[in-house]
C-alpha cells in the first residue's frame, strides 16, 4: 500500500526517512521490497526482501539495520510529523568497511526490529502512522564501493499506542546535563584542531551569508532566485557564523569523543538536534583541516554541515536528503532548502572560488 498523498507531501516538506551520500549513483526503481509490521506497543519489525534475480549487497548505515539511534521511519500523528530525537550521521562514502553492508541472495529476506519510542516522544498515545521511503545504496558483489541506489517505499503502518507505556521506554540518547561550547574533556590537541575548524567554518558561513544576500550561485545550489528565500538562507549562515565565533559560549555542545555511541568506521560526525549536540568521530580528525579548491570536505565544511542540523542555532533544522554536489543539485527546490549538504557545498563554493 502506498502512502496517502497528504502524508507524502508532509514528509517531503519536513523530513527524509533515510538519506545517503549517493553522489550521482545510478538509480534503480526495483530490487528491494520493505514491509513494516507492529510487534508491540511501540516496536516495529521491518522485513527487507531481495526481489531481483541477482545478489544485492546494501549499505546498512541510516537504514532499518543501523544499530545507532538514526531515523529509521517517519512518524505522523493528526497530520503532523512527530519530532525525531535521535541523531543524524555524516559518513565517508569513500571509506566504508565491509561490516557496513548486508548481502541478500535472490528471494532472500532479512528482518530488523526497533522501538520507535526510543527516538520519538509518543507519550501522547493514540493513533500514529509509521512509514518510510527513499533510496538504499548498494555495492556490487562483496565490494565496498557504492555503485547504485535502489528506490523503495514501505506500507503505511497504523499503530495504536498506549502513551503511558511509551513514556516508560528509555530514550536511546541520554540527557545532557552540562552545557558548554566545547566539552572540557576534549584533549588539548583535539580542542585546538576543533577551535581552528570553528574558525574556518565561521569564515565559510560569513562569506556564504554575504553571497546569498547578493544572490550569488543561489540558483545552482538552491534552485531559487526568490529574495525572501535568499534572505532566509543568509540568516541561517549568519547564525552559524555567530555560533562559530566562540569556543566557550553558544547554544550547542561539541564533543571530541563518541559520548552517544553514534560513531563507527566510516562515520565522520553526527548531530543530535533535540539536545543541541555535535560529536566528531575519529574520521573527522583524518580530514584535511583546510581545503582551498574544489568542494571536498574539510573541518570547517563538516562544522557548517552539522550546525545546519541544530535547531538551537537556526530553526527549522536541516535534514540529510543527499550528500555530494551531483546528487544535491538534483534535489527539488524544497529539498535543496532543507538539505544540510547544500549549505556546506554552497559555503565551500563561494569561499573557495568554485
UniProtKB/Swiss-Prot annotation:
Q: How is the cofactor bound?
A: Binds 1 zinc ion per subunit.
What are the UniProt keywords, alphabetically?
Cleavage on pair of basic residues, Disulfide bond, Hydrolase, Metal-binding, Metalloprotease, Protease, Secreted, Signal, Virulence, Zinc, Zymogen
Q: Give its localization.
A: Secreted
Q: Which domain of life is it from?
A: Eukaryota
- Give the propeptide segment as residue ranges: 20-179
List GO molecular-function terms, semicolon-separated: metal ion binding; metalloendopeptidase activity
This protein's GO CC annotations = extracellular region
**Swiss-Prot/TrEMBL cofactor(s):** Zn(2+)
Enzyme Commission number(s) of this protein: 3.4.24.39
Q: Which reaction does it catalyse?
A: Preferential cleavage of bonds with hydrophobic residues in P1'. Also 3-Asn-|-Gln-4 and 8-Gly-|-Ser-9 bonds in insulin B chain
Magnesium among the record's keywords? no
Question: Which positions in this protein are listed as binding Zn(2+)?
Answer: 305, 309, 320
Q: Where is the active site?
A: 306
| InterPro entries in the cross-refs | Fungal_M35_metalloproteases (IPR050414), Lys_MEP (IPR029463), MetalloPept_cat_dom_sf (IPR024079), Peptidase_M35 (IPR001384)
Q: Where is the signal peptide?
A: 1-19
- Enzyme class, one word? hydrolase
List the GO biological process terms.
proteolysis
Q: Keyword Signal on this protein?
A: yes
Q: Record's family?
A: Belongs to the peptidase M35 family.
Q: What does this protein do?
A: Secreted metalloproteinase that allows assimilation of proteinaceous substrates. Shows high activities on basic nuclear substrates such as histone and protamine. May be involved in virulence.
Mind telling me which PANTHER family this protein's record contains? Answer: NEUTRAL PROTEASE 2-RELATED, PTHR37016
Name-wise, this protein is Neutral protease 2 homolog MEP3
Q: Which organism is it from?
A: Coccidioides posadasii (strain C735) (Valley fever fungus)
